[in-house]
């Protein structure tokens, strides 16, 4: 039997560029994640991890950056030997302009990892750029996050990197609030504002469509059952047609007033249904919860 191929995403880049947000996004999509791993421990870490489930494919994301104190130049050398472990390794480098990084540090009041060297913040950023330049040069993708907010960065990671780009149709089920606008990239948009709203139940108001109490409430509503049944039938028919038409990526968006209860519930339910139907590349994104 041919051993399974494993996917490894290596996240590196400048401090303050959004690496932690990216790693958390991969974790939310069921990647096994580890942050601040020294390069020299990477082979040992992967050998142990792959032995845990050696008969199944593994999706792993790790963060390696200036905090590890390792010789970062060894990372690219190791990446090219990963195929011997039957691992497809991808290096992503997160970057941002100096002005953006300075503003983010001012907003968060966090210390730069190199500040212990007695450097000013601009000097620390400049030194980090110099030390990580070989990784930036070797990366398969450089993601400049200067113009991204948190929501845009998470969505970019999901659509561009977290879902496998292959001959399979990748599905993203998204929730949103109409008051903040319809996602322009959505292929299908469904309006859930006609459905009963858990917001008006005081005990449910602080919860979201991910919570069991909200799910229980929604599943007791006849209109919700009818709505889900009809949309499920529609998508079961047309998603298969879209894959046959060589589409590689489809976004299905559900909207409600606040983007917290109904739309989240529907996106989660449709994602679960899609996985049960055999779609392997499925993700959810809840714009107003991020």
From Swiss-Prot:
The keyword Repressor does not apply. GTP binds at residues 65-68. It holds the Pfam family PapZ_C. GO terms for molecular function: ATP binding; GTP binding. ATP binds at residues 13-20. InterPro entries: P-loop_NTPase, RapZ-like, RapZ-like_N, RapZ_C. It comes from the Bacteria. Keywords: ATP-binding, GTP-binding, Nucleotide-binding. Belongs to the RapZ-like family. Displays ATPase and GTPase activities. NCBIfam families: PRK05416.1. HAMAP family: RapZ_like (MF_00636). This is Nucleotide-binding protein Xfasm12_0753. The lineage of its organism: Bacteria, Pseudomonadati, Pseudomonadota, Gammaproteobacteria, Lysobacterales.
């Amino acid at each position: 039997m041919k051993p399974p191929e494993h996917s490894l995403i290596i996240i590196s880049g400048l401090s303050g560029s959004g690496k932690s947000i990216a790693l958390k996004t991969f974790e939310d999509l069921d990647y096994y994640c580890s942050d601040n791993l020294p390069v020299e421990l990477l082979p040992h870490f992967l050998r142990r991890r792959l032995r845990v489930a050696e008969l199944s494919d593994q999706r792993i994301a790790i963060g390696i950056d200036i905090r590890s104190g390792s010789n970062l130049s060894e990372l690219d050398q190791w990446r090219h030997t990963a195929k011997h472990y039957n691992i497809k390794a991808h290096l992503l480098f997160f970057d941002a302009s100096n002005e953006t990084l300075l503003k983010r540090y001012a907003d968060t009041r966090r210390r730069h990892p190199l500040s212990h060297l007695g450097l000013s913040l601009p000097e620390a950023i400049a030194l980090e750029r110099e030390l990580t330049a070989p990784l930036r040069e070797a990366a398969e993708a450089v993601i400049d996050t200067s113009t991204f907010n948190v929501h845009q960065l998470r969505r970019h990671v999901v659509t561009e990197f977290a879902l496998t780009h292959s001959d399979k149709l990748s599905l993203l089920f998204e929730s949103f609030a109409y008051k903040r606008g319809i996602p322009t990239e959505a292929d299908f948009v469904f309006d859930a504002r006609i459905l009963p709203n858990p917001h008006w139940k005081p005990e449910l108001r602080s919860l979201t469509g991910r919570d069991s109490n909200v799910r229980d409430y929604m599943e007791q509503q006849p209109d919700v059952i009818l709505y889900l049944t009809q949309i499920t039938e529609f998508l079961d028919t047309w998603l298969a047609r879209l894959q046959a038409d060589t589409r590689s990526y489809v976004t299905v968006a559900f909207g409600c007033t606040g983007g917290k209860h109904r739309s989240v519930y529907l996106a989660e339910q449709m994602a679960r249904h899609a996985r049960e139907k055999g779609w392997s590349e499925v993700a959810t994104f809840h714009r107003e919860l991020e």
